[in-house]
């Protein structure tokens, strides 16, 4: 088995999908998890205005609405959370995402004060925090807020990790990589776009340039620039196609570098890192 084949196997990627079937599978998955855990009544998800949170949010709202209709339990709720650092440059896109999702509840928690307070505390301890590290602090603060909301609402936190993000390790460890349930796991970037098209999302939600937008000194830095490889190349790789040797090497290098992110904290019994 080649490394490419092994990665495809581990990430459960299918070369060809039926978007309607994938939507149904994710919705049923989200419903089943709450039904299996009757002490949970809500799903919580941060909404950025990008493709991934728009899709995960819509699937969550659909699941919650079906649960309410099927059980008669009005406690089932989906809580969408805006988590800007100060003023978000593409706030209009986030509002489009909320209009598409139509969440039961929408909260806004501005993380700027918390992040800046953490930076001041670290600097007082004699540490100079890089802009890149600050970006990771932002991502982790967003998860702190989401888990606080989930803790107060008997909730579980949804993550937006998908195959194209997973293979490159393009997420913050214990930041956006920290969640309870991943309804997009197995999907490539283009497959997620196909689901949004079926769900009749505004094209701007899946046609915009993907960006984590975490670094102050590199605002709106495109994912593809940061990764050095395009999503088309990543998706082609994950769907079993042949791509350039350079792109393949880049993807596989990211895969190896990100292995630690795909594991729980390392114990003496783990050997993947050796």
Swiss-Prot record:
Q: GO molecular function terms here?
A: ATP binding; glutaminase activity; metal ion binding; NAD+ synthase (glutamine-hydrolyzing) activity; NAD+ synthase activity
User: Cellular component terms, GO, for this chain's entry?
Assistant: cytoplasm
InterPro entries xrefs? NAD/GMP_synthase, NAD_synthase, NH(3)-dep_NAD(+)_synth, Rossmann-like_a/b/a_fold
Q: Specify whether Nucleotidyltransferase is a keyword of the entry.
A: no
Which residues participate in ATP binding? 46-53, 160, 189, 211
Does the keyword field hold Cell membrane? no
Superkingdom field: Bacteria
Against Gene3D superfamilies, the record matches this protein to: HUPs
Q: Which reaction does it catalyse?
A: deamido-NAD(+) + NH4(+) + ATP = AMP + diphosphate + NAD(+) + H(+)
Residues bound to Mg(2+) = 52, 165
GO terms of biological process kind:
NAD biosynthetic process
Q: List the disulfide bonds.
A: none
One Pfam family hit: NAD_synthase
PANTHER family reported in the protein's UniProt record: NH 3 /GLUTAMINE-DEPENDENT NAD + SYNTHETASE, NH(3)-DEPENDENT NAD(+) SYNTHETASE
Q: Which family does it belong to?
A: Belongs to the NAD synthetase family.
Self-association state and partner proteins as the record states = Homodimer.
Give the function comment from the record. Catalyzes the ATP-dependent amidation of deamido-NAD to form NAD. Uses ammonia as a nitrogen source.
> Which protein is depicted?
NH(3)-dependent NAD(+) synthetase
Q: Which gene encodes it?
A: nadE
């Amino acid at each position: 088995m080649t490394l490419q084949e092994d990665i495809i196997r581990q990430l459960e990627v299918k070369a060809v999908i039926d978007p309607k079937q994938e939507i149904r599978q994710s919705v049923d998955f989200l419903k089943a998890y709450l039904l299996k855990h009757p002490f949970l009544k809500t799903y919580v998800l941060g909404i950025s205005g990008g493709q991934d949170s728009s899709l995960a949010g819509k699937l969550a709202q659909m699941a919650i609405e079906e649960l309410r209709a099927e059980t008669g339990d009005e406690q089932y709720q989906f809580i969408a959370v805006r988590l800007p650092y100060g003023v978000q440059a593409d706030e209009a896109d986030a509002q489009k995402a909320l209009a598409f999702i139509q969440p039961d509840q929408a909260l806004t928690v501005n993380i700027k004060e918390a992040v800046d307070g953490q930076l001041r505390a670290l600097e007082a301890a004699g540490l100079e925090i890089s802009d890149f590290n600050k970006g990771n602090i932002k991502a982790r603060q967003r998860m702190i807020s989401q888990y606080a909301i989930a803790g107060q609402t008997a909730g579980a936190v949804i993550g937006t990790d998908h195959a194209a993000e997973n293979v490159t390790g393009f997420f913050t460890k214990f930041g956006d990589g920290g969640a309870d349930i991943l309804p997009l796991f197995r999907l490539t970037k283009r497959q997620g776009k196909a689901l949004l098209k079926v769900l009749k999302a505004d094209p701007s939600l899946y046609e915009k340039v993907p960006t984590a937008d975490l670094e102050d000194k590199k605002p709106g830095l495109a994912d593809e620039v940061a990764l050095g490889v395009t999503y088309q190349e990543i998706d082609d790789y994950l769907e079993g196609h042949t791509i350039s040797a350079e792109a393949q090497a880049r993807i596989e290098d990211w895969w190896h570098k990100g292995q630690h992110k795909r594991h729980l904290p390392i114990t003496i019994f783990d050997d993947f890192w050796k």
